[in-house]
C-alpha cells in the first residue's frame, strides 16, 4: 500500500528529527527560516521582471509600428505633394483649358511638354507605375499618360470617387495596386482628373519587413476594409477569417497587439504577436537571470 509506505516514511523522518541533538534541530530550523524570505523575494523578483519584459515587448512593438506607419505616411506625403504640384502646373492647366487645340499643336504639346512632365517622376520614385491625366479637352488617348475624361469610367477606382478636390487614396487588393486621385473642377463641372498609380508591394514594404516569426500585420481603411494583411504564424487561427471585425476580435482576445492611425489617409495599422512569442522572451530573460 503506497499510502501506508508514505506514512511509515513520515514517521521515520519525525522520529529522526526528535532524536536529533538540539543544536542540529536549531540549525535545520534556521536554514528553513532563511530560505522562506529568499524564496519569496526570488518569486517577487521573477514576477516583477516578467511584467517588465512583457511591458517592454509591448512598448517595442508599438514603437516599431509607429516608425513603420510614419515611413508609409512619408511616401504618401511625397505623392500627395507631387499631385498638388502637377495640379497647378501651367502646362497641365493649359492642356485642361485649351479645348480647341488643333491636332498638330495638341501632338506637339502632348509629346514634348506634358508627356515628359507625367513620365519623368517615375525615374525618381520606383513605386510609381504611371501618372495619368484624364481631361475633357483630350479628344484622343496619347500613350497611357493623356486620356479622354470619358474613359475614366473604365478605371476600377472611378465609382469610389467622392465629390472632393482633395487627394483621394484607394487600394485594390486583387490587382494589387494603389492609386492617388485628384479631381479638378471648373465651378461644379468636373474638367479633369490626375491619377498616380503606385506599386502596392513597395508602398507596404515597410510593414512587410517588420512582420517576423509568430507575428502579423494588417491595414484597414476608414470603412474597415482590409487593405493589407500578412501573418507569419505557425498555428494560424486567423487564416480562415476574411472579415476585418472577426480578425480584430480574435487578435484582441488571443494576441498582443498595437495600432496606429495614419494622419493623411485615415488608414489604421495593426501589428500583433502571439502570446507564445512574448512568453518566449520572458523565458529567455529568466535564463539570463539564472
Regions found by a protein language model. Give the residues of each.
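Extracellular/periplasmic juxtamembrane segments that couple receptor/chemosensory ectodomains to their
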Residues: 222-223, 231-289
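Hydrophobic beta-strand positions
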Residues: 133, 184, 219-220
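Extracytoplasmic/periplasmic sensory segments of membrane signal-transduction proteins
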Residues: 59-156
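Solvent-exposed, extracytoplasmic
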Residues: 111-125, 189-228, 232-234
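Conserved beta-strands of PAS-like sensory domains
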Residues: 150-155, 173-210, 270-274
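Regulatory sensory and allosteric helical modules in signal-transduction proteins
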Residues: 156-172
Amino acid at each position: 500500500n503506497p499510502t501506508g509506505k508514505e506514512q511509515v516514511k513520515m514517521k521515520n523522518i519525525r522520529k529522526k528529527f526528535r532524536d536529533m541533538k538540539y543544536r542540529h534541530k536549531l540549525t535545520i530550523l534556521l536554514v528553513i527560516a532563511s530560505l522562506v524570505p529568499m524564496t519569496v523575494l526570488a518569486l517577487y523578483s521573477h514576477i516583477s521582471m516578467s511584467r517588465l519584459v512583457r511591458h517592454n515587448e509591448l512598448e517595442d512593438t508599438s514603437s516599431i509600428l509607429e516608425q513603420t506607419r510614419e515611413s508609409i505616411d512619408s511616401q504618401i506625403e511625397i505623392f500627395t505633394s507631387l499631385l498638388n504640384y502637377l495640379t497647378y502646373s501651367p502646362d497641365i492647366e493649359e492642356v485642361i483649358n485649351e479645348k480647341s487645340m488643333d491636332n498638330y499643336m495638341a501632338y506637339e504639346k502632348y509629346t514634348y511638354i506634358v508627356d515628359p512632365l507625367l513620365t519623368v517622376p517615375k525615374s525618381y520614385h520606383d513605386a510609381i507605375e504611371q501618372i495619368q491625366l484624364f481631361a475633357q479637352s483630350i479628344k484622343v488617348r496619347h500613350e497611357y499618360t493623356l486620356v479622354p475624361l470619358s474613359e475614366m469610367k473604365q478605371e476600377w477606382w472611378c465609382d469610389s470617387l467622392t465629390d472632393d478636390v482633395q487627394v483621394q487614396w484607394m487600394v485594390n487588393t486583387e490587382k494589387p495596386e494603389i492609386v492617388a486621385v485628384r479631381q479638378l473642377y471648373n465651378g461644379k463641372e468636373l474638367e479633369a482628373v490626375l491619377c498616380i498609380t503606385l506599386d502596392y508591394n513597395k508602398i507596404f514594404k515597410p510593414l512587410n519587413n517588420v512582420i517576423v516569426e509568430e507575428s502579423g500585420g494588417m491595414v484597414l481603411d476608414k470603412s474597415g476594409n482590409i487593405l493589407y494583411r500578412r501573418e507569419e504564424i505557425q498555428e494560424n487561427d486567423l487564416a480562415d477569417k476574411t472579415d476585418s471585425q472577426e480578425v480584430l476580435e480574435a487578435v484582441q482576445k488571443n494576441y498582443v497587439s498595437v495600432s496606429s492611425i495614419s494622419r493623411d489617409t485615415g488608414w489604421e495599422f495593426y501589428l500583433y504577436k502571439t502570446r507564445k512569442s512574448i512568453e518566449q522572451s520572458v523565458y529567455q530573460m529568466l535564463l539570463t537571470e539564472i
